[in-house]
Amino acid sequence: MALKHFNPITPGQRQLVIVDRSELYKGKPVKSLTEGLSKKGGRNNTGRITVRFQGGGHKRSYRFIDFKRRKLDVVGTVERLEYDPNRTAFIALIRYTDGELAYILAPQRLAVGDQVVAGNSVDVKPGNAMPLSSMPVGTIIHNVELKPGKGGQIARSAGTYAQLVGRDQGMAILRLNSGEQRLVSGACFASVGAVSNPDHGNINDGKAGRSVWRGKRPHVRGVAMNPVDHPHGGGEGRTSGGRHPVTPWGKPTKGKKTRSNKATDKFIMRSRHQRKK
């Protein structure tokens, strides 16, 4: 889908660039596949702010997405492509031959009327799902599981994908968008193709209000605060903060490594931080 630019008849339209969604379905989502979504405003169950700068935004309903794709060898037809306010990718409504409806992540080049199927030996075409052990090396994939049966966790954002680059002792070797290479069990399912809406990275909101509509409030810099509010606060006139960057609670940030999950280090063959040769 193309990008839309606007004549600047208001200041907020001068820089505005959005994705043209005219080809998507205009109506409401399937009611049986949605539920209400209550606003948290960045608060936890005690009412305290645990994530700053969140709140407000347009009301949403949550669409249940089938990330597991375990309805094996049942052909489904794409009824329509829809917008989903809860993610950057578009979603596709699938009607299976037994009458069941489901939402899946829409890959690129998936069109209304196309047929998709999940199984152990199915064609390698966009929207089909199969175990990594059944895919040819070099396949572009998305919605990749990390644990068999848990549902896809990798490559779910707009325009993202992973590539199957090899196999080793029942494990699949994947190259991710970040440059990381990692091992994943060959029994894990993945869907073929790259995720839809690749132009998402080119949009320009044009005004602060569009972030507010999404529930994002103004992100205040620490150096603009008072000393009581942030370690970088205070000082006469503008200052640099006077120390290495820290969080409001004094922990180092901006480049400080935070990964502590040593248990899965052995599955990462090449770190995303490794210098490109």
From Swiss-Prot:
SUPFAM superfamilies reported in the protein's UniProt record: Nucleic acid-binding proteins (SSF50249), Translation proteins SH3-like domain (SSF50104)
Protein name: Large ribosomal subunit protein uL2
Known function: One of the primary rRNA binding proteins. Required for association of the 30S and 50S subunits to form the 70S ribosome, for tRNA binding and peptide bond formation. It has been suggested to have peptidyltransferase activity; this is somewhat controversial. Makes several contacts with the 16S rRNA in the 70S ribosome.
Alphabetical GO biological process terms: cytoplasmic translation
CC per GO annotation: large ribosomal subunit
This protein's record includes keyword Ribonucleoprotein: yes
Gene designation per UniProt: rplB
InterPro entries reported in the protein's UniProt record: NA-bd_OB-fold, Rib_uL2_dom2, Ribosomal_uL2, Ribosomal_uL2_bac/org-type, Ribosomal_uL2_C, Ribosomal_uL2_CS, Ribosomal_uL2_dom3, Ribosomal_uL2_RNA-bd_dom
Chain segments carrying region Disordered: 222-277
PANTHER family: LARGE RIBOSOMAL SUBUNIT PROTEIN UL2M, RIBOSOMAL PROTEIN L2
Keyword Ribosomal protein: yes
SMART domains: Ribosomal_L2 (SM01383), Ribosomal_L2_C (SM01382)
Lineage: Bacteria, Pseudomonadati, Pseudomonadota, Alphaproteobacteria, Hyphomicrobiales
Domain of life: Bacteria
Subunit structure: Part of the 50S ribosomal subunit. Forms a bridge to the 30S subunit in the 70S ribosome.
Family membership: Belongs to the universal ribosomal protein uL2 family.
